Design a protein with these regions (language model features):
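Mid-domain alpha/beta scaffold segments of enzyme catalytic cores
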Residues: 137-140, 171, 176-178, 190
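Alpha-helix N-cap/helix-start capping residues at coil-to-helix junctions, especially the first residue
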Residues: 129, 135-154, 189, 200-276, ...
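Sec-dependent N-terminal signal peptides
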Residues: 13-21
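N-terminal signal peptide c-region/cleavage motif recognized by signal peptidases
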Residues: 28-30
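N-terminal secretory signal peptides that target proteins for export/translocation
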Residues: 1-12
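C-terminal functional module detector
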Residues: 34-70, 74, 81-114, 119-125, ...
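Alpha-helical scaffolding segments of alpha/beta enzyme cores, especially the outer helices
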Residues: 72-75, 173-181, 234, 238
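The substrate-binding groove and active-site-proximal loops of carbohydrate-active enzymes
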Residues: 59-64, 158-172, 218-230, 328-338
Length: 580
């Protein structure tokens, strides 16, 4: 297999100080999928994908006029153009390597019925089919989406109360159709499709959704929905019962938009041993960036917002954008508790054999326009959930273009990609395809000078460390140069996680390549600790600034962010001390 970094630096180039940086002669191969599959080896390929995609089969996409199908979404991910609701055509500048279409399980029945001959004479289908459009989307969203999943308890649509057998049959047939389209698009060694769907838990507008991703074509017979299975424990119990390893079925449940969760779904003080075990098994990842904002971190107090955590924030109350000063101290702390950094910090309290909240990081788009991987700030014109046209999209300018997930996999097959996800050898980006490796050096070995990548532990791994650890961060820029590399360190002591942001390297003019070695001189082997890298690009124009400039109307939006600093977040490496 090709080597991502080969002879990046001569040994003489590495600084004798704790921090060593070299950017001469490095190169990064784009893996050949066919060679990877034909000649498996210890080297891994960096693959790019999107694990959060909606099409017309999701009701919240359909009401805004999305007509594209899962098959259309897969073709778009492979590089084909797609015509959107407003008649414009979009296309990726580079194909993706893998995609999962994750339709909302709750409305597979309704969208199927309304797309079939059964729709004739049904008032709800007539209402949807005649009105669905960017202009009417918000009203239809309130009529059908809000009424089913945002109350204290989920409620089925009236259509399914009146005729549950019709809805059950259509939910099954629609899920089967998604599977068939997913199988038809699968091209092992070139393009992988993963089966999945979204469980849409939203009590009282508090967001605790999970994307369910499967390892193979052995999947649950039904798409598990929030209406029938209204708690995360019920979701896991149903997966335990219907997705068994003996039947070659394995799944992950990936939470997203924890920035909109207001603290729910991650309270562990009253959790049963069974629930803790299920969380450790199923929730090995968290989606930390997508079109509804970034969920990496919040500071301890709202007035302390700084560059550390103030990237693409999307603060909400009952799913509506809200300013930081609108929250009480208690509300702020509750909201902060479900951001990714707080969650993995809380997970440091658990012993090696109990690993809830030990999660790696991914990004995806959450597109509702069947456009996986479409994250280009220069051409993205707003979320499909905002409507079309400048005025509609700019009203929702707090939304983001979305992210991607980078996976270090043995080969481009769904099983190999799933295994990398389960091992957390993955990372998130806010859109750019930034090359990133993060490893714990073996006995202070010089990974920057090595022919291959052979760390003692790599991103996503749990280990036990007895001496001051040396880490290596290898980075290759995408299109925009890299300007800084940081390590975020969390240390568990005095019953809480203490956070540090450590700047390893900063080059304002930017660079295309970097390899950094850093020793943690403050390491305490008695304390559970994690480290993850964060890489930032040079500042570039944000999509909203591009759109308002094209319209000649930027002066109307003086508070709108004009730029952003795109970035990548590596999954952590954990040190968990042995217990007696």
């Amino acid at each position: 297999m090709p080597k991502p970094f080969t002879k990046a630096c001569k040994k003489s180039d590495i600084s004798q100080l704790i921090l060593g940086v070299c950017m001469l002669g490095a190169y990064w191969f784009t893996p050949s999928a066919s060679a990877t599959c034909d000649r498996p080896s210890d080297e891994k390929a960096l693959l790019w994908g999107d694990l959060h995609v909606h099409t017309s089969y999701s009701l919240d996409a359909s009401v805004f006029g999305t007509l594209a199908t899962p098959a259309d979404a897969y073709r778009f991910a492979k590089g084909d153009p797609l015509t959107r609701t407003d008649g414009s055509t979009v296309q990726l500048d580079r194909p993706l390597d893998f995609v999962a279409v994750t339709e909302h399980a709750e409305w597979l029945d309704f969208t199927s019925i309304c797309d079939s001959p059964s729709a004739e004479g049904l008032a709800d289908c007539d209402n949807l089919l005649t009105k669905r459009s960017p202009q009417n989307g918000s009203a239809l969203f309130g009529e059908y989406v809000v009424t089913t999943i945002t109350g204290a308890e989920p409620q089925p649509l009236s259509l399914c109360v009146d005729d549950p057998e019709l809805c059950e049959a259509n939910a099954l047939s629609r899920w089967q159709s998604v599977q068939e389209q997913t199988e038809a698009a699968y091209d092992p060694c070139t393009f992988s499709t993963l089966h999945g769907y979204e469980w849409s838990h939203t009590p009282n507008f508090r967001h605790a959704h999970r994307n369910v991703i499967f390892r193979s074509d052995s999947v649950t017979k039904e798409a598990i929905d929030y209406i029938r299975f209204p708690t995360v424990e019920a979701l896991w119990d149903e997966l335990d019962a219907t997705c068994r390893r003996d039947d070659q079925c394995e799944a992950l449940t990936i939470p997203h938009n924890t920035n909109m969760g207001n603290g729910i779904s991650f309270e562990l003080t009253q959790a049963s041993p069974k629930s803790l075990q299920q969380r450790a098994q199923y929730e090995r990842l968290i989606e930390i960036t997508q079109e509804k904002g970034t969920s990496e971190c919040l500071p301890s107090r709202a007035e302390n917002l700084s560059e550390d955590c103030e990237f693409e924030l999307f603060l909400t109350r009952q799913s509506r954008p809200t300013d930081p000063d609108a929250f009480t101290e208690q509300e702020w702390q509750q909201m902060r508790s479900t951001y990714a950094r707080s969650l993995v910090g809380k997970g440091l309290a658990f012993a090696p054999d109990e690993a809830p909240l030990r999660m790696g990081f991914i990004g995806s788009t959450d597109t509702h326009a069947a456009t996986p991987g479409y994250v280009d700030e220069a051409s993205w014109s707003g979320s499909a959930l905002a409507g079309t046209g400048f005025d509609a999209s700019i009203r929702s300018n707090a939304w983001s273009a979305g992210g991607l997930v980078g996976v270090w996999a043995e080969e481009n097959t769904r099983e190999a990609i799933f295994d990398a996800l389960a091992k957390r050898e993955v990372y998130a980006t806010s859109g750019p395809r930034i090359g990133l490796r993060f490893g714990l050096n073996e006995d202070d070995a010089e990974l920057c000078t090595a022919d291959g990548w052979m760390p003692r532990a790599t991103m996503g791994e749990v280990t036990q460390i007895t001496s001051k650890p040396m880490f290596t961060v290898q980075v290759q820029a995408d299109i925009t140069p890299i300007t800084s590399i940081e390590i975020i360190k969390l240390t568990y002591r005095d019953n809480r996680a203490h956070e540090e942001v450590i700047l390893l390297w900063h080059k304002p003019e930017g660079a295309a390549l970097a390899c950094i070695q850093w020793t943690d001189e403050q390491f305490d082997s008695a304390s559970a600790t994690l480290w993850y890298p964060r890489v930032k690009e040079r500042t570039t124009p944000r999509w909203s600034a591009v759109q308002c400039a094209a319209a000649g109307r930027c002066d109307e939006f003086p508070q709108m962010d004009a730029t952003l600093q795109e970035r990548a977040w590596g999954s952590p490496i954990w040190h968990i001390p042995a217990t007696d």
